[in-house]
UniProtKB/Swiss-Prot annotation:
Tissues in which the UniProt entry reports expression: Specifically expressed in roots (only in steles of secondary roots).
Annotated cofactor note: Divalent metal cations. Prefers magnesium or manganese.
GO biological process, alphabetically ordered: malate metabolic process
Binding positions (a divalent metal cation): E272, D273, D296
Site positions (Important for activity): D296
Protein name, UniProt field: NADP-dependent malic enzyme 1
Cell cycle keyword on record: no
Complexes and interactors: Homohexamers and homooctamers.
Localisation: Cytoplasm
Catalytic reaction(s) noted: (S)-malate + NADP(+) = pyruvate + CO2 + NADPH; oxaloacetate + H(+) = pyruvate + CO2
UniProt enzyme class: oxidoreductase
Length: 581
């Protein structure tokens, strides 16, 4: 695969004339008719975010579609509109204000929203998604304006198929669904977790090029155990404690069956921010019957593995020679560990069980060891190794002597000065990944990692941090952001018509991402490529994933494209305005 080495490139994969959805790929070469239930015109056209262009409507379009007098006389092109909006957004003092401004734009002018996001992805990504989306979910009831997805609740049991049919789009390719029980590191936010599927799917379109009309955000509302929300007069969800057990399982099963019945075999269902006990169970239950993906387990694992594979060039040692210690043994931690073990098993030509022996996990009760096995949850048991009990992280570091420290605990500042110094005393180049988000939950900051390691740490985080200067050298830490992986991963599934997700596809995605890191990136201390080239990166990931789907016999779109990278690029949604007949 060809590397993307120019970190200053705009994310400008424009899409081709005909995309994978079998229609015009939003290019300006073809005039189109703004169909709704009827041809939109006049005031209704200005109110339709799919077709509204604001002041960019041409003189001819204003006459043809009865817009004369409904707009000021000036005609502004999309580039100038984008410049004006970016200036306006930069005037806001607080990230949540910027988030609300972007949401309002998305609801008013869809193409301008995506054009702005694609062209300014590094600046706006922390606003559209983590960390700002966490605050937006906490205050979702207060800032709610209009629905952007489907809300399915216990009240809809027995009629979920009818609810799905209420959604106006029929050709759905990607669904992101949450039950709101574990939103980022913020806990149970109930129905207000809808901000997560909406934000994730905005990135599927902006970064991965999946058409917005093919994306469906869904919240499954089974109640909330958050007393603050239950007592909030502006809370928008069911005011009851969470349903569990059979009642919960039956609702989810009805949803999964209805999705398959309504949208077919090839629709991707991404589980998002489910609590650990449900996340693993749902993935295991439906992975053989549906095209399912859990970003918290599989997406996080793939992006972290990519960083570790990339870092091999800085540590000068293969992954199989490393020893890993995790703080956090939930869905993220165990998912990452499992994918690392799979990768090492292929690298060493050994069994996954043998590879697991190089990976240790610490949970709230200390190091996971064999003597604790009877009391462990099932998903933790494969990581229980023979060792005497160790109560805390620092003790585990001294006992295990890891070369890689990975945090997925959700406990802010748990990588203390003593922890970083201990890692630095063991390793010349300690590899430290503080993955928890939002920023307040990060195990340490970039400044702490570089300062306490005396500039020797190789560092990546789950939340964004500013560059750090230490003893005259500037270190640019990179964010191990799932947004590197899931948009391109999803696009790869779409263009191949995949019917199932296989672990080898996750490895393929990780290898594709690692292959995009340039020499210039490494010199700055980065183990991930610049986000400014994310669309080109996503195309490479999509091509790798699609190729693997064809190799595994899981691709349903035949014949196989001759040039899969070109196919991925030409399938991408373009937000450039179209001319109307």
């Amino acid at each position: 695969m060809e590397k993307v080495t120019n970190s200053d490139l705009k994310s400008s994969v424009d899409g081709g004339v005909v995309d994978v959805y079998g229609e015009d790929s939003a290019t300006i070469e073809h005039n189109i008719t703004p169909w709704s239930l009827s041809v939109s015109s006049g005031y209704s056209l200005l109110r339709d975010p799919r077709y509204n262009k604001g002041l960019a409507f041409t003189e001819k379009e204003r006459d043809t579609h009865y817009l004369r007098g409904l707009l000021p006389p000036v005609v502004l092109d999309q580039k100038l509109q984008e410049k004006r909006l970016l200036n306006n957004i930069r005037q806001y003092q607080f990230p949540l204000q910027k988030y609300m401004a972007l949401t309002e734009l998305q609801e008013r002018n869809e193409r301008l929203f995506y054009k702005l996001l694609i062209d300014n992805v590094e600046e706006l990504l922390p606003i559209v998604y983590t960390p700002t989306v966490g605050e937006a979910c906490q205050k979702f009831g207060s800032i709610f304006r209009r629905p952007q997805g489907l809300f399915i609740s216990l009240k809809d049991k027995g009629k979920i198929l009818d609810v799905l049919k209420n959604w106006p789009e029929r050709n759905i390719q990607v669904i992101v669904v949450t039950d709101g029980e574990r939103i980022l590191g913020l806990g149970d936010l109930g129905c207000q977790g809808m901000g997560i599927p909406v934000g994730k799917l905005a990135l599927y379109s902006a970064l991965g090029g999946v058409r917005p009309s093919a994306c469906l955000p869904v919240t499954i509302d089974v109640g909330t155990n958050n007393e603050k929300l239950l007592n909030d007069e502006f809370y928008i969800g069911l005011r009851q404690k969470r349903a569990t057990g059979q009642e919960y399982s039956e609702l989810l099963n009805e949803f999964m069956s209805a999705v398959k019945q309504n949208y077919g075999e090839k629709v991707l269902i991404q589980f998002e921010d489910f609590a650990n006990h449900n996340a693993f169970e749902l993935l295991a239950k439906y992975s053989d019957t549906h095209l399912v993906f859990n970003d918290d387990i599989q997406g996080t694992a793939s992006v972290v593995l990519a960083g570790l594979v990339s870092a091999q060039k800085l540590t000068n040692s293969p992954l199989a020679e490393h020893t890993f210690l995790f703080l956090g043994a939930g869905e993220a931690g165990t998912g990452i560990a499992e994918l690392i073990a799979l990768y090492m098993s292929k690298q060493m030509n050994a069994s996954v069980e043998e590879s697991r022996k190089k990976i240790w996990l610490v949970d709230s009760k200390g190091l996971i060891v064999n003597s604790r096995k009877d009391s462990l949850q099932d998903f933790k048991k494969p990581w229980a190794h023979e060792h005497e009990p160790v109560k805390d992280l620092l003790g585990a570091i001294k006992a295990i002597k890891p070369t890689v420290l990975i945090g997925s605990s959700g406990v802010g500042r748990s990588f203390t000065k003593e922890v970083i110094e201990a890692m630095s005393s063991i390793n010349e180049r300690p590899l430290i990944m503080a993955l928890s988000n939002p920023t307040t939950q990060s195990e340490c900051t970039a400044e702490e990692a570089y300062t306490w390691s005396k500039g020797r740490a190789i560092f990546a985080s789950g939340s964004p941090f500013d560059p750090v200067e230490y003893e005259g050298k500037v270190f640019v830490s990179t964010q191990a952001n799932n947004a590197y992986i899931f948009p391109g991963f999803g696009l790869g599934l779409v263009i191949s018509g995949a019917i199932r997700v296989h672990d080898d596809m996750l490895l393929a995605a990780a290898e594709a991402l690692a292959g995009q890191v340039s020499k210039e990136n490494y010199e700055k201390g980065m183990i991930y490529p610049s986000f400014s080239s994310i669309r080109k990166i996503s195309a490479q990931i999509a091509a790798n994933v699609a190729t693997k789907a064809y190799e595994l016999g899981l691709a349903g779109r035949l014949p196989r494209p001759k040039d899969i990278v070109k196919c991925a690029e030409s399938s991408m949604y373009s937000p450039t305005y179209r001319l109307y007949r």
